[in-house]
Regions:
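Juxtamembrane helix-loop-helix connectors linking adjacent transmembrane helices
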Residues: 45-55, 80-149, 167
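Membrane-interface helix caps and helix-loop-helix hairpins in membrane proteins
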Residues: 47-49, 185-193
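Hydrophobic alpha-helical transmembrane segments
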Residues: 27, 55-56, 94-99, 139-143, ...
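Aromatic-anchored segments of alpha-helical transmembrane domains
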Residues: 32-42, 105-111, 180-188, 226-232
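Membrane-interface helix/loop boundary segments of multi-pass membrane proteins
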Residues: 152-178, 207-214
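Functionally important transmembrane alpha-helices
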Residues: 35, 190-238
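Small-polar-interrupted transmembrane alpha-helices in polytopic inner-membrane proteins
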Residues: 172-187, 202, 223
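N-terminal, membrane-interfacial amphipathic/helix-forming hydrophobic leader that caps
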Residues: 1-92, 118, 230-238
Length: 238
């Protein structure tokens, strides 16, 4: 996943792929994502009635958005499996991607982001602690929400937006950077410091997908990261 490899493959990758959906479709997806950010801001202040309804709302919204992307892909005759890429014809292929995912979470999610977070003095708002699960039902729903995000957000950002922006700019690198920025903006309710870290993390996920020509390792990494982050935070708070 060296930078030289990414640069050398830049024009080659984008020359073989056109836009994956109409421009109006992408504009509408971007508009809907603003709702995710608004919902996130709302969730920070909702605790009295429990978190389960809000987790379910996020799960539903993400699947609806992926369904809309699937609709847009269909208008261009692009199967969802082409956007996801890769395959698991045998267990060895799955465990290979799982190993890559674990290494990515530990090295990039752990070492790099923690280092940058320390330099930026980026800390989550206290209200965000209320987003983490407290009860058994909430923990189960958190896991479901985490793996929903692992699949859906990788399809949305590293699949759909990355391919779309790369086609428009004729550059895979630009596609990776732009989708990372949108990923950060979708988490804008966390403050500009954390938003910047999330945008950078999104770009790292984009490079991983570009390197592997598949969203699968990123999906596994994303699901693992979100699951572990929420459950660990829940136990550390008690």
């Amino acid at each position: 996943m060296a930078a030289a490899e990414l640069i050398s493959a830049d024009t080659v990758t984008t020359s073989t792929h056109g836009a994956v959906a109409p421009a109006w479709h992408t504009a509408l997806v971007l508009f809907v994502l603003l709702g995710f950010s608004v919902l996130g801001a709302r969730l920070q202040h909702l605790t009295a009635h429990g978190r389960s309804p809000d987790y379910l709302a996020v799960i539903a919204m993400e699947w609806v958005l992926v369904a809309f992307i699937w609709f847009g892909l269909g208008r261009r005759g692009i199967p969802m499996r082409d956007l996801v890429g890769g395959s698991w014809p045998h267990l060895a292929a799955f465990f290979r991607d799982l190993g890559i995912a674990v290494a990515f979470v530990l090295l990039v999610g752990g070492a790099v982001l923690n280092g940058l977070g320390y330099l930026l003095k980026a800390t989550p708002p206290k209200a965000m602690q209320e987003l983490f699960p407290h009860t058994l039902i909430e923990m189960i729903l958190w896991v479901v929400m985490s793996w929903t995000a692992g699949f859906c957000e990788e399809v949305i950002f590293r699949g759909y937006f990355s391919r779309q922006f790369a086609a428009w700019t004729k550059s895979a690198i630009a596609g990776i950077v732009l989708q990372g920025i949108v990923f950060g903006l979708a988490h804008g309710y966390q403050g500009w410091k954390l938003m910047s870290l999330i945008a950078f993390y999104g770009m790292c996920f984009g490079m991983l997908a570009h390197w592997r020509r598949s969203l699968r390792p990123g999906m596994l990494a994303h699901g693992l990261q979100d699951t572990a982050g929420g459950l660990l935070a829940r136990f550390l708070m008690h």
